[in-house]
Amino acid sequence: MDDWSAEQYLKFEDERTRPSRDLLAQVPLSAPRKAVDIGCGPGNSTELLVERWPQAEIIGIDTSADMLRRARERLPGQTFIEANVAHWVPPANTDLLFANAIFQWVPEHLRQLQRLLGALPSGGVLAVQMPDNLDEPSHVMMREVAHSGPWRETLADAARAKDVLPRPGAYYDALRPLCQHIEIWHTIYNHVLADTAAIVEWVKGTGLRPFVDPLEPTERKEFLREYTARIAAAYPLQADGKVLLRFPRLFVVAIK
């Protein structure tokens, strides 16, 4: 997959940042020495950390050069590092690991969360949010279109049914032995979008990438045409012509 596009991602900045705000509201730290925003993207979530704890050392890490470029432009006084969290080790004196919408992309992420929580000092916090929407029409339709067109072989890996997130109890059992307190909850957002085309624009910034990036321009256009038609059928218009994008998310806050 090509590099992430910060411009595409930020088309829905307010909606994408809201889960970060909701996650941050449950972090019970008054004065962390160091906080790391894992999967910082274009810096919208990092900015929330800076605003809440202006005296703390705030670090953002991401694998995307384009996302990091935008983050550095947005917050020139902060430190941003290109790193893969699967191989990354938290620096000393880190009191908060904050991860908004990143670990759903990380293989064996339960094991990674255990490793990272174990690296925190006593009282440190691991705060994680992940989309839990693979069974939503927005994602089911991606796989259906991938299976139904001339791109079937090209998209075989992308179209393979992905594992949904583990049940909440799996996170509890994995993390509770490593911490003194843990909170786990789901929130279902109903984002008000202009029309069904806006849903397509939303997922083009994230979940649709593995499906459209491997295609040639002509095939990509046809894939998006078919996907858009199916999305229009799956998401009825409201009385004012807008649509509601149902978006479940899982939250975990563990205090070591």
UniProtKB/Swiss-Prot annotation:
CDD domains: AdoMet_MTases. One of its GO terms (biological process) is methylation. Signal peptide: none annotated. Keywords: Cytoplasm, Methyltransferase, S-adenosyl-L-methionine, Transferase. One of its GO terms (cellular component) is cytoplasm. One of its GO terms (molecular function) is trans-aconitate 2-methyltransferase activity. Its main location: cytoplasm. Its EC number is 2.1.1.144. It is found in: Cytoplasm. It catalyses: trans-aconitate + S-adenosyl-L-methionine = (E)-3-(methoxycarbonyl)pent-2-enedioate + S-adenosyl-L-homocysteine. It comes from the Bacteria. The keyword ATP-binding does not apply. Pfam families: Methyltransf_25. NCBIfam families: PRK01683.1. PANTHER family: TRANS-ACONITATE 2-METHYLTRANSFERASE, TRANS-ACONITATE 2-METHYLTRANSFERASE-RELATED. Catalyzes the S-adenosylmethionine monomethyl esterification of trans-aconitate. Belongs to the methyltransferase superfamily. Tam family. This is Trans-aconitate 2-methyltransferase. It comes from Nitrobacter hamburgensis (strain DSM 10229 / NCIMB 13809 / X14).
